[in-house]
Amino acid sequence: MPLSPDEIDARRFAARRHEIVERILPVVEQRLSDGGSYVTIKVEEILQEASLSRSTFYRYFKDKNELLLALIGPVLQDVRIAAIRPLERTSAPTRKQLQADLAVNFDVYRPHIPLLNALVEVSYSDPEIRKHFQQGFADVHQTIAGHIAYGQRAGFVRPDLHPAETAAWITWMAERGMTQLVAEADAAGRGRLAESLAAMVWHTLYEGQSSS
């Protein structure tokens, strides 16, 4: 069935908006990496570096916060996929396996830490941004809780844990650790951080349980 004119226009709009987001993302991430604050970055500065006009920008985005939501969407999706990948196992990992998984997560998360920090910064004053940030990590929390509950039934996760509460601690401990510790660590430091986090999670979830 052929698309209607409205559907064609909507697809064109979405494609062009995505193109603009891809163009602006490296500009914003570079400014944030240089120590800038998203709150104080001016739209005009972003547009100048991205070679975009004001009219083009405001056709696709209501304001700078709506742009932030568009920029962060793919980032949160990448973070979510990386975070849940180690939990797809149906048996307990070894500490070395868990450490390797977390090292991969660090590599996915680290380039986007400035943008994620911007999301936290703006979330204090914008309820919609705050809701988006919390929902992004709520998905990770729910996946970890599901893994714990499944592992308890299968016998490879400790039975004395509260799945939802334990998952919440792991989720938000890791989120803060990524932004406060991993962001500034060199390669050797990141290795030690991955080893340390793996030890905490492994002892919390799997110690003393069957690995099969």
Which sequence ranges carry the predicted segments?
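Basic, helix-initiating cap at the start of DNA-binding domains
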Residues: M1-I41, E45-E49
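Short, basic, alpha-helical segments at the C-terminal edge of helix-turn-helix-like DNA-binding modules
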Residues: V43, I72-R80
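Secondary-structure edge/capping motif, primarily at the C-terminal ends of alpha-helices
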Residues: A83-T90, L116-S123, G177, L181-A185
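C-terminal peripheral helix-coil segments that are non-catalytic and often amphipathic
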Residues: M1-E7, P111, G146-A154, A168, ...
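Short secondary-structure transition hinges
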Residues: P111-T143
